[in-house]
């Protein structure tokens, strides 16, 4: 697998994350209903440019989405022409397959704007990011088992930030909420990587723990969007669950390592 393809894949994944963060910022600033609620046109000169700062935010989100979309198409081309790992090919294909529905949902968030549509827009974007993150994990070598414990400890150190920035206890500015999503997506990505690497080592229970942690972290992000009237304290409960999951991962790996070294860890 070429370094160029790997770098482009990682870059497009990072671009997708930035696009999601810009979209969340747009939603929290109420800019999604600017551009006179028109899509794909805006409210400025000839409908191609924004008329004010609020519509500029929405316009920038659309422009970035277009750029990221074209980059992903190029990544898909390279995935099928320049590298041999079929898992990576199909993961990137799945991400690009979801793009048309995501574009349609993005348009509907402007013209319709219901809680269900905006939630579907977030879910689809999350699935695209998940497919790309999985593809990234599959392009790197599987680390040794002891690195999984290090990963769990590092992820556990991030959970307090996930807990503190969610806005469930104090009213926080939009910039802090975007920080919450940044931390949360990175945390979820690390947990997904842990699940895939645990699977590669045959560690079934560790894989399930990592996967559960990633799922709860994502659910916290969905609840934090405040679209369905769910109690914001659920995000705090979720953060504590993730922390307990990571403690269980570290404890299990430590116990197995002490009991019989690497061989015992593999025999899950």
What spans do the regions from the language model cover?
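Polytopic transmembrane helical bundles with strong interfacial aromatic enrichment
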Residues: 1-268
């Amino acid at each position: 697998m070429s370094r160029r393809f790997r770098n482009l894949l990682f870059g497009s994944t990072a671009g997708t994350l930035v696009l999601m963060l810009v979209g969340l910022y747009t939603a929290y600033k109420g800019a999604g209903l600017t551009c006179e609620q028109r899509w794909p046109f805006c409210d400025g000169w000839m409908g191609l440019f924004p008329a004010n700062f609020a519509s500029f935010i929405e316009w920038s989100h659309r422009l970035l989405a277009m750029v990221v979309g074209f980059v992903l198409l190029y990544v898909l081309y390279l995935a099928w022409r320049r590298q041999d790992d079929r898992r990576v090919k199909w993961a990137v294909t799945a991400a690009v397959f979801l793009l048309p529905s995501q574009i349609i949902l993005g348009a509907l968030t402007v013209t319709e704007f219901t809680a269900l549509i905006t939630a579907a827009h977030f879910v689809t974007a999350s699935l695209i990011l998940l497919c790309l993150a999985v593809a990234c994990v599959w392009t790197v070598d599987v680390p040794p088992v002891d690195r999984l414990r290090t990963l769990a400890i590092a992820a556990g150190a991030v959970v307090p930030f996930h807990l503190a920035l969610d806005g469930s206890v104090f009213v926080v500015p939009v910039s802090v909420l975007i920080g919450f999503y940044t931390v949360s997506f990175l945390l979820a990505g690390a947990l997904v990587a842990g699940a895939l690497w645990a699977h590669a080592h045959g560690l079934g229970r560790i894989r399930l723990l990592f996967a559960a942690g990633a799922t709860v972290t994502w659910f916290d992000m969905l609840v934090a969007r405040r679209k369905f009237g769910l109690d914001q304290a659920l995000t705090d409960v979720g953060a504590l669950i993730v922390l307990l999951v990571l403690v269980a991962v570290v404890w299990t790996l430590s116990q197995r390592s002490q009991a019989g070294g690497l061989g015992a860890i593999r025999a899950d």
